[in-house]
């Protein structure tokens, strides 16, 4: 995968049309997780958190490692870097989240959901209406009645929902259950404003510049910037992560 450059969107693609303001960073390769951890540690910012998504599908098991292999490799990398308290593992495939909760309870998990026409990972399949969705690790939406209650039943503390699925009712229900609520992927100013007005606990966005601008307009505290091109003073540098076996 490191043969591919990630620093520039293919100009003729529809994706490029969605992000005309993207600033290219040529000769950018896909980093390993270890390399990403080391990069942020070199910047000296101890507040940066890592939101790591496991990418696998119960509908295409041959395409990736098993949930067990993937989750355990991720747990190992996080622990070796000493960053367990600064990492959250999120996934649409809740099997990996269940493994992380059992085997690394110090690492937070976030339950990704969507109930859209183009993606629905919580509703039963039309071919098996009484069975749980293959994505939800055996937890059945029909038995629990709502997505917030489904996430809560799975042991989740963070519900990360598609922004269009969130409204005042289910946000209030989630908060009453003790869940934090994140919205993804929020890129338009009107969407950002609506969700901040609604009272979500966090936003996932491809446009952090727009999110920060709206937060600043509202007088909300902004996360500290993390330049990574200048090394911090020697006494603030974190040691590099140990080599992986």
What is each PLM-predicted segment?
Residues 111-112, 119-245:
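C-terminal active-site rim and adjoining tail of enzyme catalytic domains
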Residues 1-108, 115-116, 130-143, 152-162, ...:
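Metal-dependent phosphodiesterase/phospholipase catalytic core, i.e.
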């Amino acid at each position: 995968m490191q043969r591919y450059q990630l620093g520039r969107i293919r100009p003729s693609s529809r994706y490029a049309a969605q992000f005309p303001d993207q600033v290219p960073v040529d000769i950018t390769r896909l980093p390993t997780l270890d390399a990403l951890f080391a990069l942020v540690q070199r910047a000296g910012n101890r507040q940066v958190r890592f939101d790591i998504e496991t990418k696998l599908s119960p509908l295409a098991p041959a395409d990736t490692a098993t949930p067990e292999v993937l989750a355990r490799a991720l747990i190992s990398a996080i622990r070796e870097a000493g960053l367990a308290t600064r990492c959250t593992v999120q996934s649409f495939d809740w099997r990996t989240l269940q493994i992380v909760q059992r085997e690394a309870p110090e690492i937070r998990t976030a339950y990704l959901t969507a109930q859209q026409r183009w993606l629905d990972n919580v509703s039963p399949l039309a071919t098996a209406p009484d069975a749980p969705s293959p994505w939800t690790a055996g937890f059945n939406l029909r038995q629990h009645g709502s997505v917030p209650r489904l996430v809560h039943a799975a042991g989740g503390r963070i519900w990360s929902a598609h922004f269009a699925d969130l409204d005042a009712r289910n946000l209030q229900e989630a908060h009453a259950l003790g869940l934090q609520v994140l919205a993804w992927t929020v890129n338009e100013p009107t969407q950002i404003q609506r969700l901040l007005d609604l009272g979500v606990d966090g936003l996932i966005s491809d446009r952090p510049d727009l999110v920060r601008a709206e937060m600043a307009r509202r007088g909300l505290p902004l996360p500290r910037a993390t330049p990574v091109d200048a090394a911090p003073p020697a006494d603030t540098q974190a040691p590099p992560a140990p080599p992986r076996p």
